[in-house]
């Protein structure tokens, strides 16, 4: 029996991989043993949903980065020579006016343009970085393959480092469309890299120095079930579940969370604009962070949908049922109003008309404006 380690340190991997047919097909093979590596805080809920006779969920301690690991991560973040990182530096300067930090990060970013510097950094990071808490698991299970589902997550990087030392082949994945240009310099190049699209493959080659021969484009696995209309909840049943009338048009509105836009009351402006339209508005609140409406009283044609919420992307969990509800919400909508988020892709999969929020309600600096996010590389054609 072959053993595969699958990382699940980033919360949405449950949606992206574990709930897909790709994972199901692996789990159904009697000649494979799948070991899901997850943080202590989420291991229990993953066991409840995905454990099976040949699928084991192992809890792994994931302490906050410190010491040399923290230094390596900060350096990797600033070495990434992308347009998104330049936007992030400008936005930070607008917020804190720390010119020393801005100039230092600009210098490091300039050095990151040179391939030699990037390769030297990776060599030093591999030599100086830690291996995390998984060494005993390698001894216990002796894996034949590591599938690192987020090659930019610190714990995935540590595991790839450990796998290389143990001679275990590693397949890595770029988890989302913005990761290559917005996270860090790719610290470990796996034996194979899987990506969603040709554009991400090109970015991985340009910014991550990944040889084209080891990159495979696989699409976005969880959209297979989005497009399967047999899995969609019937219209009348769905509308009843969210207290809406199935005879009327539906607008899905997903406001930005306070992780990205603080103290700017965008949702009330949008909802007041929609107050008199001949349609219902389903307001899907963020799954990470909050969208604080204060004492605002929404119009009678608006209904709020509050999915399970988490403080960050490490702790968030989108169960199969919750993901199905999200897909149903988009499928049954006639228009999607959102902002610079992955909801753009989710709505496009269903070929829905999309309106993006591109304004600030109050006058604010670039570093606090919603407009900065539309300057990110992955948002530009």
Question: Could you describe each region identified by the protein language model?
Answer:
Residues 7, 35-135, 140:
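Conserved N-terminal ligand/cofactor-binding loop architecture of enzyme catalytic domains
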Residues 121-125, 129-130, 149, 161-235:
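Active-site-proximal region of nucleotide-activated glycan assembly enzymes
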Residues 187-190, 210-212, 342-381:
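Catalytic binding pocket for nucleotide-activated donors in carbohydrate/polymer assembly enzymes
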Residues 1-16, 39-40, 60-63, 252-255:
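Nucleotide-activated donor-dependent transferases that construct or modify glycoconjugates
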Residues 18-25, 223-314:
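Conserved catalytic-core segment of nucleotide-activated headgroup transferases in glycan assembly
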Residues 5, 91, 135-154, 333-340:
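Short N-terminal targeting/anchoring amphipathic segment
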Residues 167, 334, 351-353:
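A short alpha->beta transition loop at the rim of the catalytic pocket in nucleotide-sugar-dependent
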Residues 133, 138, 288-345, 349:
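Donor nucleotide-activated moiety binding/catalytic core segment of transferases
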């Amino acid at each position: 029996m072959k053993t595969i380690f699958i990382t699940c340190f980033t919360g949405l991997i449950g949606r992206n991989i574990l709930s897909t047919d790709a994972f199901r097909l692996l789990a159904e093979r009697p000649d494979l043993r799948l070991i899901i590596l997850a943080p202590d805080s989420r291991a229990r809920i993953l066991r409840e949903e995905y454990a099976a006779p040949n699928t084991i969920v192992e809890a792994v301690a994931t302490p906050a980065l410190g010491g040399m690991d923290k230094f390596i991560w900060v350096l990797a973040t600033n070495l990434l020579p992308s347009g998104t990182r330049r936007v992030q530096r400008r936005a930070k300067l607008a917020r804190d006016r720390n010119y020393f930090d801005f100039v230092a990060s600009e210098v490091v970013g300039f050095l990151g343009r040179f391939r030699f510097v990037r390769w030297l950094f990776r060599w030093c990071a591999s030599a100086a970085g830690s291996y995390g808490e998984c060494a005993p698991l390698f001894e216990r299970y002796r894996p034949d393959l590591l599938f690192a589902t987020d090659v930019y997550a610190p714990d995935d990087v540590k595991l790839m480092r450990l796998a290389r030392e143990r001679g275990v082949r590693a397949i890595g994945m770029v988890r989302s469309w913005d990761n290559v240009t917005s996270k860090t310099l790719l610290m470990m190049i796996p034996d194979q890299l899987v990506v969603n699209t040709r554009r991400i493959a090109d970015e991985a080659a340009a910014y991550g120095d990944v040889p084209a021969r080891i990159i495979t484009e696989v699409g976005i696995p969880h959209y297979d079930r989005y497009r399967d209309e047999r899995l969609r909840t019937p219209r009348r049943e769905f509308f009843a579940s969210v207290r809406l009338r199935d005879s009327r048009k539906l607008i899905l509105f997903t406001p930005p969370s306070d992780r990205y836009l603080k103290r700017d009351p965008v949702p009330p402006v949008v909802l007041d604009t929609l107050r008199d339209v001949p349609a219902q508005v389903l307001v899907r609140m963020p799954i990470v962070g909050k969208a604080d409406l204060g004492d605002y009283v929404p119009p009678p044609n608006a209904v709020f949908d509050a999915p399970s919420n988490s403080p960050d992307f490490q702790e968030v969990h989108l169960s199969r049922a919750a993901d199905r509800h999200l897909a149903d919400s988009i499928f049954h909508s006639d228009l999607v109003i959102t902002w610079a988020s992955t909801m753009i892709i989710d709505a496009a999969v269903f070929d829905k008309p999309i309106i993006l929020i591109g304004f600030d309600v109050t006058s604010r600096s670039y570093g606090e404006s919603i407009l900065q996010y539309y300057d990110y590389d992955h948002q530009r054609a």
